[in-house]
Amino acid sequence: MALDLFKRVETRKGLFAVEKITLIYNLLTSILILFLFQEMDHPVQMLADRVVIAGMTFLLMYLYRLAPCKFSAFVRIAIQMSLLSYWYPDTFEFNRIFPNLDHVFASVEQWMFGGQPAVWFCERFPKMWVSEPFNMGYFFYYPMILLVVVWYFLYRFDLFEKVSFVIVTAFFIYYLIYIFVPVAGPQFYFPAIGSDHVAQGIFPSIGDYFHHHQELLPGPGYEHGFFYNLVESSQQVGERPTAAFPSSHVGMSTVLMIMAWRGSKRLFACLFPFYLLLCGATVYIQAHYLIDSIVGFVSAFGIYILATWMFKRWFAQPMLR
């Protein structure tokens, strides 16, 4: 397999599709910040961050023209994808000003299932042999993204830009939902209302409680497990009381599995066990209500189709000539 990573190539000028959609999301959320300026916690810093991201994007475009090759193209796209770790907690800065809706979703969950599956699951299976595989699956989320993207880069470079665009666009669609649908999930909501209320099926509204309280208590499972502690550490760093409905972990991993299936059945087969564990883990570690995960799965197909259509309709151009 001749990669020719550093071989100079003829390339089109301008922004890649994934950079364009990032700038569009950047602009849309900047406008939203201006509308909500008086209510937001640190709007000036958020706007400054967006200016830096836009400036960095155009700088990378310029530097790429000095040495256009597959590797520098990968770097440009990888940087945009890495910014998802910024855009995700950024959604909380918007939805923290809206009344929390967890009481609605917990009540629907109670009505549909006669209780809380997120509580049942971890209470019935607290042992290491259940906890560790599920936490491993949950932690595998970002490696799964990396594996699919790198596979397309190495083996189907002609589809690399499309795949990266669809992934980032799908994330942005979920993020826009999270901005306007403030649901934190059981891991934040249940400690806030107390276990007695949960056991009795009473789910009070907590208003803007998470505007001032973002503490995340240790989750359920085998507390001495290696993967349990990996998940706990990553959540303490990057998790916020946001993004529960629908589950982007389930939704995006489903999008990735669609891409894996279309690209390589062997890749799909290798990822499938981790995918199943990841989906189960969203409820097991109480990151999501079961309805979040179900809607995440169903929504993935529509979002994949929409993002693919957007690429073909407005953004499709060959990266290299």
Q: Where is each model-derived feature located?
A:
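Membrane-interfacial alpha-helical segments at the cytosolic side of multi-pass membrane proteins
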Residues: 148-152, 250-268, 298-307
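Membrane-interfacial catalytic/cofactor-binding modules of polytopic membrane enzymes
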Residues: 180-262
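Interfacial helix-loop-helix junctions of multi-pass membrane proteins
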Residues: 185-188, 244, 277-303
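Membrane-interface loop-to-helix entry segments
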Residues: 130-144, 240-259, 290, 294
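Interfacial segments of alpha-helical transmembrane regions
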Residues: 74-78, 146-181, 187-201
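Aromatic-anchored segments of alpha-helical transmembrane domains
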Residues: 27-35, 83-88, 171-179, 275-284
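N-terminal transmembrane-helix/juxtamembrane module of multi-pass inner/ER membrane proteins
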Residues: 2-52, 71-146
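Membrane-interface helix-boundary motifs at transmembrane edges
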Residues: 11-12, 40-44, 63-75, 152-163, ...
